A protein has these predicted regions:
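Intrinsically disordered, low-complexity Ser/Thr/Pro/Gly-rich regulatory segments
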Residues: 1-216
Length: 216
């Protein structure tokens, strides 16, 4: 399985209310409130975080139905935070909010939005961005993250860019990479009434594919 096939899984997915709800509930309560308040300074940040969580929940759901996906790294409220051990070797360490981060010599060297591994041992990382055209130095960031992951895992890795607005396919993508547009995916929360989200507790989706990122 390839990055293009992961992109196709997302593109062809049938979105459910449960996925949208779980995605919104991954956000801390203050950000959930900002999600439904267009006057909030944090509104756009909340939409971006929601979109990231939404893609993660879609990946879990689609992976469960696919024999080609062996694992999706847990993140956000599904992740298990462990304080950093300064004697540990370089690798993945979750942030307190469940972000997927890689530390080198004790410092955060990279953060990625998702990690997927296929049954034929292809490792894929992804970035989730509403509009990549506004993302600044995304090309150099992707190159640096790719180089780090290939060094840590000693294999070639593929990349998927997920965005919510139509853009030209970036020139920096390799032939093995892929891009997918989930149009207005950052607005899916609007399908839910705020009361379905604002004060609910997180409950992880049932998944046989979700794994701790440290064993991805």
């Amino acid at each position: 399985m390839s990055a293009a096939e992961i992109a196709a899984l997302l593109r062809n997915a049938e979105v459910t209310g449960g996925e949208i709800r779980r995605a919104a509930i991954h956000l801390p309560k203050p950000l959930r409130a900002s999600l439904y308040d267009e006057t909030s300074r944090e509104h756009r940040t909340a939409e971006g975080k929601f979109f990231e969580a939404f893609v993660y929940e879609m990946l879990l759901a689609e992976a469960e139905q696919s024999d080609s996906v062996v694992s999706v790294a847990a993140k956000l409220s599904d992740a298990c935070y462990v304080p950093y051990d300064k004697y540990a070797k370089d690798g993945l360490w979750y942030s307190k909010d469940g972000g997927i981060r890689f530390k080198v010599s004790g410092r955060v060297a990279a953060e990625v939005d998702f990690l997927v591994k296929t049954t034929d041992c292809v490792r894929i990382f992804g970035e989730v961005i509403v509009n990549p055209a506004k993302a600044g130095n995304l090309a150099s960031e992707v190159a640096e993250k790719r180089a780090l992951l290939e060094r840590l895992y000693e294999c070639e890795v593929q990349f998927v860019l997920v965005c919510a607005e139509q853009v030209k396919e970036p020139k920096y993508l390799r032939e093995t990479d892929a891009a997918v547009v989930l149009e207005s995916g950052h607005l899916m929360y609007q399908r839910l009434h705020p009361n379905e989200v604002l004060h609910k507790k997180s409950a992880p989706a049932k998944s046989t594919r979700r794994v701790d990122g440290t064993v991805w």
